[in-house]
Amino acid sequence: MESGGKTNRQLRKAICVSTDEKMKKKRSPSVIVIGGGMAGISAARTLQDASFQVVVLESRDRIGGRVHTDYSFGFPVDLGASWLHGVCKENPLAAVIGRLGLPLYRTSGDNSVLYDHDLESYALFDKAGNQVSQELVTKVGENFEHILEEICKVRDEQDEDMSIAQAFSIVFKRNPELRLEGLAHNVLQWYLCRMEGWFAADAETISAKCWDQEELLPGGHGLMVRGYRPVINTLSKGLDIRLSHRITKISRRYSGVKVTTEKGDTFVADAAVIALPLGVLKSGMITFEPKLPQWKQEAINDLGVGIENKIILNFDNVFWPNVEFLGVVAETSYGCSYFLNLHKATSHPVLVYMPAGQLARDIEKKSDEAAANFAFSQLQKILPDASSPINYLVSRWGSDINSLGSYSYDIVNKPHDLYERLRVPLDNLFFAGEATSSSYPGSVHGAYSTGVLAAEDCRMRVLERYGELEHEMEEEAPASVPLLISRM
């Protein structure tokens, strides 16, 4: 996938078109794809399959972006995305996963109050290590769903938006019977903690108007048992990918696009697909020439970027209950904890601590060792005899210069159509990524589908410009292979 020592001159020759060649009607159009995550790889795959000359420029020393499967434990664990949200044939990634025969472990069915988990296999504890009864957890869950229903009524009555936290306060004032005390209050805060984890953001910043605008595919949610790496590797096979190429400038002209890297290398093509994380676009690290129009820049500025991290603890034996997840309830959502039990799905003795929002930001200030110790201290609150982990992994999506956040979400007082505004092409620049998916933001299949869509838009626009619409894309209908789903 790397350049194999090609010189910059050779690279230009590979993707640039001379004046004489432009006169040839049958030449292959050229596209630069900026970003080698799921969106960028799916865009490049689609364009190359349509006989376009494509080069992918990726700032990291690996492909995948926020899809990152690590093998240092001797088996795969995902530091980034790990779920397929919507285990069904309608999911655009289902065909790829099915053809590869990759197993999924279903953690929830449709319409679960916990989004990616059902209340079937869990253990919640208070900070003293006492397990919370299933009856109370179920009762508080029903209360939480009732609160969300009341929030929808509150927001529909008002023109102005508000945060989920503000909406909670209004609901409690109107319906004091929904306000809980003692242990029940702490369990309610744990439900709120899991809602914050879904959006990778704090309730004080999540829009009450837009929190439920994404489309949830049927079939529930499935963990990728072998990780997402096989998917990204398959899609990237045969692509010209240049790693460690950080972009600093994107210049658009009528005749084409010129991209400049921090090392001073330049790449020229007919068009470019920009498949960069929203956090990177927000940072201003990349200069656009000419500047992006106000409507496009506002879309970048006004979408929220959340943070959810993973602290993955690997043990030499299993000492915890045989449930899908463990949790610690507390007086505030910030003080609650959530551990995903990978042993249930993969048979490996691994627990994954997953902080989000401000808690994730605070933990990112710690060293890897301190972060792992913090996660283990949360585990010791509920399992005081827990053995120490033999090794650990820590993600830092918020401070990673290549991501600067985990995924997008709707913030207060900003419209949901910002996703679509970010997606809309700008001359010969096309945009892809989970933050351009109004239906499936924050998901791998959302990123994948926007990459395909950007590639199709790019193909049509470029071929129209060169009068080559007869150069049709060869489509192969993927064989429908059933997904391998388990639930132990």
Curated annotation (Swiss-Prot):
FAD binds at E58, R66, E434. Pfam families: Amino_oxidase. The keyword Membrane does not apply. Binds 1 FAD per subunit. Its cofactor is FAD. One of its GO terms (molecular function) is thermospermine oxidase activity. Expressed at similar levels in all tissues tested. Highest expression is seen in siliques. This is Polyamine oxidase 3. It comes from Arabidopsis thaliana (Mouse-ear cress). The gene is PAO3.
